[in-house]
Amino acid sequence: KIIYFGKSIEQRMNGTCAGGTGAFLDQMASLLNTDTAGLNELAKGYQTIYPIASRCGVFAKTDVQPLLNEGAAKEDIAVSILQAVVNQTISGLACGRPIRGNVAFLGGPLTYIPELRKRFVETLHLTPEQTIVPEEAHLLVAKGACLDAKDMTPISVEKLKSKIQVLRQSHDTTTQPLKPLFTTNAEYEEFKTRHE
């Protein structure tokens, strides 16, 4: 996830797959017969970074397995996996928008895998002054949510349903909604029958 702070807050999140997440890193580490702590240790001793896909764990595995078969150093594969996460985050989430200024590294993988942070810092050419690694960075988002919710007034389920209904009825003039695939249950049932 990337959050840009400017005149307004812009959040960008990967909604397509697990590439770049802790689960992805766990899966890649298992290919090297280690865990994420071991992946971090291996990455410290690298010589070469290889291109590896991180869009999807399956694609990444098809890049990692041949490297293992060809005898590439596990250190090089480990750092290449971390660099793949960096590349995916920058290209897939930033989508060409520069990542500038101070950068705070939050969340589990960025807390527990310092070599991943290092890859981001080097790739983004961040200075030590621009690099922010808060204490308990893995908990900072949860703490923020608690602080934000502290002054909120609880509402009933009925009131929440009412608010959701109002949102559904509001019209966003910047986008045109798509027509529903089926306007009635009968149309849906006919579709299911046709495609069984």
Region locations from a protein language model:
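Flexible inter-domain linker/hinge segments
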Residues: M152-E196
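Gly/Thr-rich phosphate-binding beta-strand-loop-beta motif of the actin/hexokinase/Hsp70
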Residues: K1-G6, E196
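Glycine-rich phosphate-binding loop plus the immediately following alpha-helix
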Residues: I9-T48, H138, L147-D151
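Glycine-rich phosphate-binding loops at beta-strand->alpha-helix junctions
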Residues: A94-T123, P134-H138
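Glycine-rich phosphate-binding/hydrolytic loop that grips phosphoryl groups
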Residues: L25-D26, V133-S170
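Adenine-nucleotide phosphate-binding core of ATP-dependent small-molecule kinases
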Residues: A60-S91
